[in-house]
């Protein structure tokens, strides 16, 4: 089994990802979805966490070999980013969703030199808006952001377009396609539910159970 599928299987097993095609979730954006993800759950499982961070380290070495500093997004990207930085023996920083309203007013916390090559760590990519705002904040403070890594992506077309428009490279450990394939192979969903899950990938904006 590939590392991508192995991680997808782990996310299902520990219920970091929940699938409910017949009784969909409603995201904050208003999108009706057959899937809900809370990757913070992975932190409670040492073996899963270790596999994720090791896979992240290998992914970064392959996709972004020039990296000089790891940055996590607040708050979900911080624990993963800190562990990855330790794996890679690199400096770590984190990026707030907005600047502090007191003190120095920092948005990027830590020491990042002008032109330092950075990879930003996020746990989940949905529409991509928040992590791209973090990338922009890091770049305003002088970082040279090589790209973004994440555990999981819903593969929304909106996110793909945003990353393309921003000219930011995205690399993830696993994705929606791999996850529903694993769900099928393990009997996690019925044939009818699988079809609903596939339809969501084809058109998330208009999908209905």
UniProtKB/Swiss-Prot annotation:
It catalyses: orotidine 5'-phosphate + diphosphate = orotate + 5-phospho-alpha-D-ribose 1-diphosphate. One of its GO terms (molecular function) is magnesium ion binding. Its EC number is 2.4.2.10. Pathway: Pyrimidine metabolism; UMP biosynthesis via de novo pathway; UMP from orotate: step 1/2. SUPFAM superfamilies: PRTase-like. The keyword Protease does not apply. Belongs to the purine/pyrimidine phosphoribosyltransferase family. PyrE subfamily. Homodimer. This is Orotate phosphoribosyltransferase. It comes from Lactococcus lactis subsp. cremoris (strain MG1363).
């Amino acid at each position: 089994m590939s590392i991508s599928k192995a991680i997808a299987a782990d996310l299902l097993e520990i219920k970091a990802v929940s699938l409910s095609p017949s009784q969909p979730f409603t995201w904050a954006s208003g999108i009706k979805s057959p899937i809900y993800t809370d990757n913070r759950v992975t932190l409670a499982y040492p073996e899963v966490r270790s596999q994720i961070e090791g896979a992240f380290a290998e992914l970064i070495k392959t996709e972004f070999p020039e990296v000089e500093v790891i940055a996590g997004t607040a708050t979900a990207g911080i624990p993963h980013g800190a562990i990855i930085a330790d794996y890679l023996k690199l400096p770590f920083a984190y990026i707030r969703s907005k600047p502090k309203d007191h003190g120095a007013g920092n948005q990027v916390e830590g020491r990042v030199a002008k032109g330092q090559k950075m990879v930003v760590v996020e746990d989940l990519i949905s529409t991509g808006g928040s992590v791209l705002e973090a990338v922009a904040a890091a770049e305003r403070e002088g970082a040279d952001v090589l790209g973004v890594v994440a555990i999981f992506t819903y593969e929304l077309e909106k996110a793909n377009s945003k990353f393309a428009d921003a000219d930011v490279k995205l690399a993830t450990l696993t994705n929606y396609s791999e996850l529903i394939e694993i769900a099928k192979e393990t009997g996690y969903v019925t044939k009818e539910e699988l079809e609903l899950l596939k339809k969501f990938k084809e058109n998330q904006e208009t999908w209905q159970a």
